[in-house]
């Protein structure tokens, strides 16, 4: 291990971070008032951090002006009570740097970055991309490995290499492969805070040492997510944590395996009494039958029985 590359973990991000939905009006415009109220509600439920403009937040469907408004509204709602980590993904290094600098200037605590979509950069190109962003900002970077969406897989050895960059402090691992979490912790857990990015392996991830969980279903069941973290990480009451996790699992599995993650998250929010609108087209709202499935899954845990 290269001791020179070790980084301080003082004030580190940890806990449950909501991959924040972007509420939409009937016509497809962003509902900023609802976004602010929804973010405040999540913080009130004990969520430790907010991640606007991620996959669940439909960043790919928003223009630059809308992205800025989402950040401003989220930061105002958070009011320093919870860190805001902005998704700043884009198709080019130039745009990622611009979005990341904007996030820093607005007051975000960090940025979350996946590989640029569609262009399929090779690993040497990807390293140069992250290095350029690293050199352009002074806030932490959370790497985001989600090859199912980006087409580029960042294996643990490559992430270990990226950990040598000053601002690279965290990684959200979203392949759903538990060995990835353990290998990241083994290779660079002393330098990177590892976050689970796949809902169905959250409990196992906590048990082996993940510092947190970035999830979209946090929008739906925030109190349950926070309680699971408290039981598994803070209290180490694994019996109670397992019981709660098994109650949440039908919902988590339906979301992860249904092929309509964003659509289902938004539909489930409505079932829970918080109408955040439909996804922006080309995605469509969940069907009546799908909503019935979601309702039955939600009822398996105490928080979801109000659906």
Annotate each language-model stretch with its function.
Residues 22-26, 61-64, 120, 148, ...:
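Generic structural "secondary-structure junction" signal
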Residues 2-151:
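Active-site beta->alpha loop and helix N-cap motifs at the rims of alpha/beta catalytic domains
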Residues 81-82, 140, 169, 191, ...:
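Secondary-structure boundary/capping positions in well-ordered alpha/beta enzyme cores
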Residues 45, 69, 73-78, 102, ...:
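Alpha-helical structural signal in soluble globular domains
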Residues 35, 67, 71, 96, ...:
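A general structural signal for well-ordered alpha-helical segments in protein cores
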Residues 2-5, 12-21, 41, 45-47, ...:
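C-terminal alpha-helical cap/extension of soluble enzyme domains
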Residues 135-136, 147-249, 255-256:
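Catalytic alpha/beta core domains of metabolic enzymes, predominantly
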Residues 62-65, 98, 123-126, 154-156, ...:
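Short secondary-structure transition/capping segments
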């Amino acid at each position: 291990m290269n001791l020179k590359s070790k980084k301080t973990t003082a004030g580190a991000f940890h806990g449950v971070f909501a991959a924040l939905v972007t509420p939409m009006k009937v016509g497809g415009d962003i509902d900023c008032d609802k976004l602010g109220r929804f973010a405040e509600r999540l913080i009130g439920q004990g969520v430790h951090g907010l991640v606007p403009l991620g996959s669940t937040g439909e960043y790919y469907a928003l223009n630059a002006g809308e992205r800025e408004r989402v950040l401003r509204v989220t930061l105002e709602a958070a009011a320093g009570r919870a860190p805001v980590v902005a998704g700043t993904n884009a198709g080019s290094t130039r745009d990622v740097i611009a979005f990341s600098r904007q996030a820093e200037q607005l007051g975000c605590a960090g940025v979350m970055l996946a590989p640029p979509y569609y262009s399929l950069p090779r690993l040497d190109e990807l390293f140069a991309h992250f290095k350029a962003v690293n050199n352009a900002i002074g806030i932490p970077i959370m790497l985001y490995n989600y090859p199912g969406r980006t087409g580029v897989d960042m294996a643990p050895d490559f992430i270990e290499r990226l950990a040598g960059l000053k601002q690279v402090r965290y990684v959200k691992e979203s392949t759903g492969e538990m060995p990835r979490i353990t290998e990241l912790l083994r290779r660079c857990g002393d330098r990177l805070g590892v976050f689970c990015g796949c809902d169905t392996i959250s409990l196992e991830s906590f048990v082996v040492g993940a510092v947190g969980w970035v999830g979209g279903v946090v929008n739906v069941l925030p109190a349950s997510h926070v309680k699971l973290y408290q039981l598994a990480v803070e209290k180490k009451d694994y019996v109670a944590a397992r019981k709660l996790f098994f109650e949440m699992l039908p919902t988590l599995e339906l979301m992860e395996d249904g092929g309509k993650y964003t659509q289902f998250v938004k539909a489930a929010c409505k079932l829970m009494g918080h109408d955040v609108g439909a996804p922006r087209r080309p995605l469509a709202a969940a069907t009546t039958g799908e909503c019935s499935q979601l309702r039955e899954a939600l009822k398996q845990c105490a928080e979801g029985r109000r659906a």
